[in-house]
Amino acid sequence: MIKYWLKLWSTNQELFWDAIQLIHEWYFDFIELYIVPNGFDVLILEEFRSAKIPISFHLPHGAHGFNPIDPSNPSELIWNQLSVYIDFLNPFALILHPESGIDLDILNKRLSFFNENRILIENMPKKSSIINDMIFFGYSIEQIWEIKKIHNGFCFDFAKAKSSAISQWIDVINFSDVLIQLMNPNYFHISWFLWNTEIDEHFDIMEWDTLYMQYMKNKLMNIALKKDIS
């Protein structure tokens, strides 16, 4: 079975009520809420708690100052702020970007500090769409294998896999197959995107018009025959 979710940001407060209604009317199964760590009042999320709907969190990424693999990043301070929202809504999954850096020991220490078995680490593109010359960690098979040595819970993003494969000049579908087998995810990010770019893009799915989009659709259907996925 496939569960489908609706993506919102914590800054989309004007959409919260409508999103909850879509869950109640079974258009979607749950909400993935991206948390912008701007110190907002936790009571802003009361609508979700009162509605008692399933929810997952996408933890902040580097654009909002959270980089758990960078030793100079105040990840512990940001996490303490995030913990308030996590405790309030009790999300069933926490999606985490490894972001940019090379020190896996730092990531391991941060994961130990977070002490959260709900964390799902997402594969990354190689290049940043925001900062020139920034290289992400978690874009290659070798790096995912290194992460798997210290953490076993993943979210697979098809758009990021496509972008990474193009950056590496390797076959996109074969790369995705190997990565999915290695990560063994139950949680996926799907979107429409331009085919010939290294940049990570996420557009609304309007049509399944490319070979990789068809691959994505068929892959999810085949995995869902064996286990429940989101």
Q: Could you describe each region identified by the protein language model?
A:
Residues 1-81:
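N-terminal pre-domain/capping segments
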Residues 7-11, 34-38, 58-62, 99-101, ...:
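Active-site beta-loop-alpha junctions enriched in small/polar residues
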Residues 23-24, 86-87, 181:
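Non-catalytic positions within long, well-ordered alpha-helices that form the structural scaffold/packing
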Residues 2-8, 29-33, 55-59, 92-96, ...:
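Hydrophobic faces of well-ordered beta-strands that scaffold small-molecule active sites
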Residues 49-62, 113-118, 144-149, 212-226:
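Alpha-helix-loop-beta-strand connector modules within alpha/beta enzyme cores
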Residues 65-74, 132-137, 162-228:
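Gly/Pro-rich active-site loop or hairpin
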Residues 38-53, 106-112, 138-148, 170-186:
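Short amphipathic alpha-helices and their capping/turn segments at secondary-structure boundaries
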